[in-house]
Each structure stands twice: as structure tokens, then as C-alpha cells.
Curated annotation (Swiss-Prot):
The keyword DNA-binding does not apply. CRISPR (clustered regularly interspaced short palindromic repeat) is an adaptive immune system that provides protection against mobile genetic elements (viruses, transposable elements and conjugative plasmids). CRISPR clusters contain spacers, sequences complementary to antecedent mobile elements, and target invading nucleic acids. CRISPR clusters are transcribed and processed into CRISPR RNA (crRNA). This is CRISPR-associated protein MJ1674. It comes from the Archaea. It comes from Methanocaldococcus jannaschii (strain ATCC 43067 / DSM 2661 / JAL-1 / JCM 10045 / NBRC 100440) (Methanococcus jannaschii). The lineage of its organism: Archaea, Methanobacteriati, Methanobacteriota, Methanomada group, Methanococci. GO terms for biological process: defense response to virus.
Length: 634
């Protein structure tokens, strides 16, 4: 890793007499330094301060190359007056359209600069270069200069530290340097360590020329690029890196959002976006750059309709992806959004099994023939979207994909589902039962059984006064209706058996539908079943929070639910413990509002952020107390 200084050389004194041409000496002072450094060249001041390994000097044929040579040759005791005069003459003879000086003429200057570098820093590697550019008075010369600056990329290596001096020469030079540095950073992985400007204009006022590091300006351009990459492509890797020192919390959140966008993890993305907005409102006037970035973040968030329905959120993600040419993610969102919308229209949470049931309904031959809405939706999915989606998802190289028009496809899906006229869910069940009686089809039987399970879950949710959302759907289907759940209630036991039974007969299915329909809500209430389901649900959630898998540790987690002392060490555990006591002590009594409310509270708490629980109540402490409890019982 080398330190490389790139510095322009100005014209200085325009006198054609080499003996009279002068580069004015000035006292240069760095921020924080008490003493300044006198020199005709800010280049030498930077060399002394930075201890660089090599220098690249850029100037026109009219720049004061002979004075540069004179200064460094005398510093290292190798001044050649004949060479000095020759260079001076060639500089004097050069015109903007006729250069008498070539880079070959400057080789001796390169050598004395390298020796000077060794004098200042014995470890300097050397390899300095002197480069001649055009004036840049027309487009052709501008492109010639651009080519020269781009060739400097070959003078640096991966990992080198770059220092720029922009004090002298044409005002176009810093612009070329900026573009060159951008290329260097991407193709050579170099690091910008400083952009220095010797402020000669304020010498009269201050008595010295401050050497100012302007690299924060380059940092601002990094912020702008990072902001653009995130709001346009969802790529937060640059902006989050820049934000780490300014606001680590937002930096980490943007990293998560970026990962979820890349992976198309819409549930996790939605949750992160939902919590980002209030966080931004808290910090709207903070940070050097964050305060300018926050309004753009709000615009980005507003494009993702995270507060609307699942379908609206998916459609907004499809549109955002299409707008930003991320067609693969866009089509994955758009294709699956159809089944999310159908779940919404039938008042079902958009869990995977429900979406599969919706797919089964629109693909059922008798239903999509009888109801034009289902036929239209099936055609949209099967004929227009499915092949594109599968081609993307499976990276198929064996055949060409279908042509696609994202904007039209998006508009047509939205319009189709906005105005769709669907049959009642009970009517679908009636039609399918009739169809399966006349033609006992295994696919239709399986679809009906899955619909029956939906009706059972709906029935339980209504009976227990739960919300019909994904959280309660998961709790009811996975825990309350678990085939091993303990029950005092015979009706609930029968419902659980039906839920898990593989029914392959149309008549038996019809009986099951009627049984579920005719069962009163009150007949399904069971305090013991609810307590047992809550216990296993809590065990699952807390085991995940503690990342445990072995049986003994899980038993300890189950035990801690009733341990008031340990649970009191964290507010979430304390509240879970208080509510669980209410359920546990009443598990053999008739269902009450107190038990139901306590259960809802626990489910809510278990779906909050549990990441800090293990810090307040470490697993090893739980295990020690649990083992002590077991030993005392023997």
C-alpha cells in the first residue's frame, strides 16, 4: 500500500526569461499546526507533511517545470544548470497549440523528486511521474486530458492511499482529478485520504496560506450516491456504511431493509419499514447529512403502502421494482399478489395454506367454468404471469421466456381484482360438494378438506373472540387445534380430530362441514385446552428467543413461565408471568373473559421484540434455578 500524491503545476510567472521566472514563496500552515512551512511549492509542503511514497505532477507545457526542477535538484544537491536552461527555454517556446516540451524532457525532474522523497522519508518507494496535459480549450483537448488523467489509474495499485493537491493550474484540473478518482476507487480499490488546497488568496489577511483538506466535499458526493442507490434500488450498503458514525440505529435498519428487498422478504421488509418512519420523525433535525437524507427516506417509505392491505403492499412493491428495473422481484410480487387479494376478499389472513386454497379454487375446472371471475383470474395467472414468474424463479436456461410488459401486466391485475365479482364462500363449498358427489375427484376432495380446515379455524377464532389475523391463525391451527392438545370439552376434541383427519369420502366431508357449522361457539370453549396451547406457544417463542433446542432447556423454559422471581427481571416476562398465572389457576374452570384477555395479552407479548430478554434473564440462570427446583422436589 503506497501513499500517492497527485499535484498540478501552475504557470506562475509568465516571464519568458528563465532567470527571471519565479514561483512565489509562501508560508503554508495545516489546521492545528502552530508553525507553518515556507516553500514556493505547496507540493513540497505536502510531501514533508504526508511522507508520501511517490508523486504525480500534472501541468501544461507552459507550467514552471524548470522551477520545479531547480527546487528539488538543489534540495538533493544534483542541480544541472544546462538542463535547467534547456527546460526553461522549451517552456518559454511552448504555445497552447504548439508544445516544444515533451514528457521525455521531464525524466530528470522525476528522478530528483524521487530522491527528495527519499530524503524526507527513507522508506519512500519512488516512481514519480511528470505528465503534460493540453490547455483544454475545446472538446478534443478536453477528451485528450481526460485520457491522460485516466491513464494515471495505471500508476496506482489496489489499496493505495491517494492524496490530491488542487492548489494550482487550470480550474478544470480538479474536475478531471475528481472523475479520475472515481474510476480509481472502483477499479483499483484505492482510498482517498485527502484533497488539499493551499489558500493563497488569504495570505494578506492571515499572514499565511492555510492548507485546507476538502475531502469532506468528496464525502458529500458519497452521501448523495448512497442516498440515490438506496431510494432508487433499495441498496443501502453505501449509505448505511456512511451512517454508522452518524446514526448506527438507522444504519442497521437500512441494512435490514436492503437485505429484505434483495431477498424479496416482504413480511420482514414491511415490519422494518413500519418502524423506520417514527424513528425518522424523532431524528429529523439531527446529523450533518442525515437531516437532508430523511425527507428522501420518507418519499421512499410512502411509495411502499405498508399500512394498507397485504395486496396493496405487494402491488406497491411490484410497482417499485418495475419502476427501478428489478423485473424479477416485480413479477414475483405481482404474480403472488393475486392470491393475497383473494384471501383479502374472502376475509382470510394471507397465510401460505390459505393462498394455496385460493389457487386451488381458481384452478378448479368446475368453478372456473361456472364463475367467469375465477376463469378470468386463472387466465391472468396461468396464461400471462405464471410462466414469467417460473422462468425467473427457476433460472431456466432450457427454453426462451415469454415476452413481458410489466406496466400493462400490473395495471391489468389491479383492474381485474378491483372490479371482480366473486361468489360467496359458502356457495363455493356447496358447489364443490355437489361436484365431488357426482365425480369423486381426489384434487377436489383435498381442496374441500383444506376449505373445511379454514372453516374450523374461523369457527375457533370467532368462539374465542380472537382477531382474524396471521398471528392468531398460526396460534389456533398450530397450538389450540394441535392433535396432542389436552381438552376437557368433547366437542372441541371432535373438532380437533376432524381437523387432522384425512377424509377421502364426499359424504363424510359433507357431514364434517355440517358438524362444524352446527356447533355453537360456546361449545368449543375450553380453559384447559387454551392453557395448554398458550404454554406450548410460549415455549416455542421463548425457545427461539433463547435459541435452544435440547429437551431439558425447553423444560426449564416451560417452568419459568410460573416463576415470579425470575420473570420479574424483565417487563415482558413479568407481564407474561402475571397473565399466565391467571390462566393456569383457572384451567379447570369454565371459560371467562379474564382467561381470554390474559391469553390475548400473552400472545401479543410473545409477538413483540424478545431479543433483550436473554440479557436480563440469562439461560444459564434459568437452568441453574430449574435444576435446583427439581432437586428440592426429590
Amino acid at each position: 500500500m503506497l501513499k500517492v500524491l497527485i499535484s498540478p503545476l501552475g504557470v506562475g510567472d509568465t516571464n519568458t526569461d528563465v532567470y527571471k521566472r519565479q514561483y512565489k514563496t509562501a508560508e503554508y500552515k495545516f489546521e492545528g499546526d502552530i508553525d507553518g512551512i515556507e516553500s514556493p511549492f505547496v507540493l513540497s509542503v505536502l510531501i514533508e507533511k504526508l511522507k508520501v511514497d511517490k508523486v504525480i505532477v500534472v501541468g501544461t507545457a507552459k507550467s514552471m517545470w524548470e522551477k520545479l526542477y531547480e527546487y528539488y535538484a538543489k534540495e538533493v544537491g544534483e542541480f544541472d544548470e544546462e538542463y535547467w536552461i534547456e527546460i526553461g527555454k522549451k517552456v518559454g517556446m511552448s504555445k497552447y497549440d504548439n508544445y516544444a516540451l515533451s514528457e521525455e524532457d521531464l525524466k530528470k525532474i522525476e528522478k530528483v523528486i524521487d530522491k527528495y522523497l527519499k530524503k524526507i522519508n527513507p522508506n519512500a518507494v519512488g516512481g514519480s511521474k511528470c505528465k503534460i496535459i493540453k490547455y483544454g480549450i475545446d472538446k478534443d483537448e478536453i477528451w485528450e486530458n481526460f485520457d491522460l488523467f485516466m491513464s494515471l489509474i495505471n500508476e496506482v495499485n489496489d489499496g493505495d492511499e491517494i492524496y490530491l493537491d488542487i492548489t494550482h493550474s487550470f480550474r478544470s484540473i480538479p474536475l478531471f482529478m475528481y472523475v479520475m478518482l472515481e474510476f480509481m476507487r472502483y477499479f483499483k480499490n484505492v482510498k482517498l485520504k485527502g484533497i488539499y488546497y493551499g489558500m493563497l488568496d488569504v495570505i494578506r489577511e492571515l499572514g499565511h496560506a492555510p492548507v485546507v483538506d476538502l475531502s469532506p466535499i468528496f464525502e458529500i458526493s458519497e452521501w448523495i450516491r448512497g442516498m440515490y442507490e438506496f431510494t432508487t434500488y433499495g441498496n443501502s450498503y453505501l449509505i448505511s456504511k456512511l451512517l454508522e458514525n452518524e446514526d448506527k440505529e438507522i444504519a442497521e435498519k437500512l441494512q435490514k431493509i436492503s437485505r429484505y428487498i434483495d431477498a424479496n422478504y416482504l413480511k420482514e421488509l414491511r415490519e422494518e419499514v413500519k418502524t423506520l418512519k417514527p424513528l425518522l420523525n424523532e431524528k429529523k433535525d439531527t446529523g450533518r447529512f442525515l437531516k437532508y437524507f430523511i425527507p428522501e427516506l420518507h418519499k421512499f417509505i410512502d411509495k411502499l403502502k405498508y399500512e394498507d392491505s397485504d395486496f396493496e403492499f405487494q402491488i406497491s412493491m411490484a410497482k417499485w421494482n418495475f419502476d427501478n428495473k428489478k423485473y424479477s422481484s416485480g413479477y414475483l410480487c405481482l404474480t403472488d399478489s393475486i392470491f393475497w387479494k383473494l384471501c383479502e376478499l374472502y376475509n382470510l389472513p394471507s397465510v401460505y395454506k390459505n393462498r394455496e386454497v385460493m389457487k386451488g379454487i381458481i384452478y378448479n375446472p368446475s368453478l372456473n367454468k361456472k364463475y367467469s371471475a375465477f376463469g378470468s383470474i386463472k387466465d391472468m395467472h396461468y396464461k400471462r404471469l405464471r410462466n414469467i414468474r417460473n422462468k425467473i424463479a427457476h433460472a431456466d436456461v432450457s427454453k426462451k421466456g415469454d415476452d413481458f410488459n410489466p406496466e400493462n401486466d400490473l395495471e391489468d391485475v389491479v383492474n381485474l381484482l378491483k372490479n371482480v365479482n366473486l361468489p360467496d364462500f359458502d356457495k363455493i363449498i356447496e358447489d364443490l360438494l355437489l361436484d365431488v358427489k357426482n365425480n369423486q375427484n381426489n384434487k377436489t376432495l383435498k381442496l374441500l378438506k383444506n376449505i373445511l380446515n379454514i372453516q374450523i379455524i374461523r369457527k375457533i377464532i370467532k368462539a374465542y373472540n380472537f382477531e382474524s389475523n396471521e398471528i392468531y391463525w398460526d396460534f389456533v391451527s398450530g397450538y389450540l387445534l394441535n392433535k396432542n392438545n389436552k381438552c376437557n370439552n368433547e366437542k372441541l376434541r371432535e373438532i380437533i380430530e376432524i381437523f387432522h383427519k384425512n377424509i377421502e369420502d364426499a359424504g363424510e366431508l359433507e357431514e364434517a362441514f355440517n358438524f362444524v357449522k352446527n356447533t355453537e361457539d360456546e361449545e368449543l370453549l375450553d380453559s384447559l385446552a387454551l392453557q395448554n396451547a398458550i404454554m406450548h406457544y410460549a415455549l416455542f417463542k421463548l425457545s427461539n428467543a433463547y435459541n435452544i433446542k435440547n429437551k431439558e432447556d425447553k423444560e426449564a423454559i416451560k417452568w419459568v413461565l410460573l416463576n415470579q422471581n425470575l420473570c420479574s427481571k424483565h417487563p415482558i416476562l413479568k407481564e407474561i408471568n402475571n397473565n399466565y398465572h391467571k390462566i393456569f389457576k383457572n384451567k379447570d374452570k369454565p371459560m371467562s373473559n379474564e382467561i381470554l384477555e390474559a391469553s390475548k395479552n400473552i400472545i401479543r407479548l410473545l409477538n413483540s421484540d424478545l431479543s433483550e430478554i436473554k440479557d436480563s434473564v440469562p439461560l444459564n440462570l434459568i437452568i441453574i434455578r430449574y435444576r435446583s427446583y427439581k432437586n428440592n422436589r426429590r
